[in-house]
Amino acid sequence: MTVFNKFARSFKSHWLLYLCVIVFGITNLVASSGAHMVQRLLFFVLTILVVKRISSLPLRLLVAAPFVLLTAADMSISLYSWCTFGTTFNDGFAISVLQSDPDEVVKMLGMYIPYLCAFAFLSLLFLAVIIKYDVSLPTKKVTGILLLIVISGSLFSACQFAYKDAKNKKAFSPYILASRFATYTPFFNLNYFALAAKEHQRLLSIANTVPYFQLSVRDTGIDTYVLIVGESVRVDNMSLYGYTRSTTPQVEAQRKQIKLFNQAISGAPYTALSVPLSLTADSVLSHDIHNYPDNIINMANQAGFQTFWLSSQSAFRQNGTAVTSIAMRAMETVYVRGFDELLLPHLSQALQQKTQQKKLIVLHLNGSHEPACSAYPQSSAVFQPQDDQDACYDNSIHYTDSLLGQVFELLKDRRASVMYFADHGLERDPKKKNVYFHGGREASQQAYHVPMFIWYSPVLGDGVDRTTENDIFSTAYNNYLINAWMGVTKPEQPQTLEEVIAHYKGDSRVVDANHDVFDYVMLRKEFTEDKQGNPTPEGQG
């Protein structure tokens, strides 16, 4: 019998097993990292062969279930990341997943339906292969020994890697060992969750660090500073910036009181990195979470301000996340469950507190976070139909604008100022099931271009700068901007708003979801353009 005939007979008898191997291999090569592909494929095949030779069906299913579910979940995550963002899954995405609260996950389930279906299909496919006891396959002894050799070799390589890392960093990390070992298994993406867990532990270790600053405190004539951080806001959908629908009438009515930034850009296309970049001394080029304690809250506290953090982004996992490591330093923190307007009573209470101290009040909004149709009460919808994604997104912008109008009303008779900016923008592709989505690898300018302005109460008169800024200004330098706005600076920093803007304007470096640094100016303007700025066939029409 020829080799071909033997293979043909084997394929006919075990075609489902061959199909599993092909699906696993192609999915991992296309949508995941190709690193250690041979070991991962051997691990996958040998595990299936070992399990198929377990004679007891209950025991076979008991052993198979965790392997099947983890492998299917890993592949589904890879497919989601690749199809949605055009990049492989990474530790940045893993951090975002771990920081998502249950309410947010439930709201976004509709966006994940195709990948939940993929998970179900892959799970059933792998179970269909494993469920049948097959004596024609190599014995458990042979496949078991081979599997142990693969596992032992992988563990040895992982230990070598962890040892070198410990030698360089003078400290051993079990997360590095677990992360490296995962890269040799079918559960490759566990590697990124291990790295995310390591980041979580590092954040816990530094969250209570309060540095001492040499500060220069200058009287700006302002007593109350309200900093509003929006979520997932696109400049292209704001009439303040020329959009055809009237989505920002309240802000536009205050145009004479506003210093507008026409070319503000976020340092990163996702919240877990963009907000710390904006509120701490961290930077695009030298990202290090040890910079996080050097933040606007700690500086305001040391300068004698009364500080508040009011958030409609869930308090789930309050400890050990990048944003909450900053928020927890505020003297008073409030988290609400529901729409952004629920923050207004807490803002009123903060304003009414009698004190001789200046106040810094941070409002962290849910804004236009996906799915936008759930970001506002249906009674607040002004654009129809309400199940249209563009109408939903525009309604979310209008809802935020209404909230801003109410904030202005609360502050108009006070010596107060409001700074508003969004953490990042969003991509838009009308051909996709989910039209609006976060930027991924080499994101377009739309994922970074954000609204930003400073509003000054009429009580402050004409002695403040309300001119429009047309140069690029990255929110990665907003910690310096906010410090100067409050009149609380370090000697080495620019001291005034004008000095900060003059010093940092034009720096257009951004980081994408793959942690690669790009020049914003060189990115394509829209997601539906190719890298040279030409409309793609999918984006035409």
Feature map (PLM): residue ranges:
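Active-site-proximal cap/lid insertion segments
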Residues: 315-319, 366-415, 432, 440-449
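Active-site-proximal alpha/beta segments of enzymes that process anionic O-linked groups
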Residues: 159-381, 449, 475, 479-508, ...
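Short beta-strand segments
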Residues: 309-311, 360-367, 394, 417-422, ...
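Membrane-interface soluble catalytic domains
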Residues: 8-18, 54-56, 127, 131-134, ...
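Active-site rim elements
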Residues: 30-34, 284-286, 388-397, 405-408, ...
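Transmembrane and membrane-interface helices of multi-pass
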Residues: 1-179
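Histidine-centered active-site microenvironments of extracellular/periplasmic hydrolases
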Residues: 242-246, 421-458
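Metal-dependent active-site segment of extracytoplasmic phospho-/sulfohydrolases and closely related
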Residues: 226, 399-437, 479-483
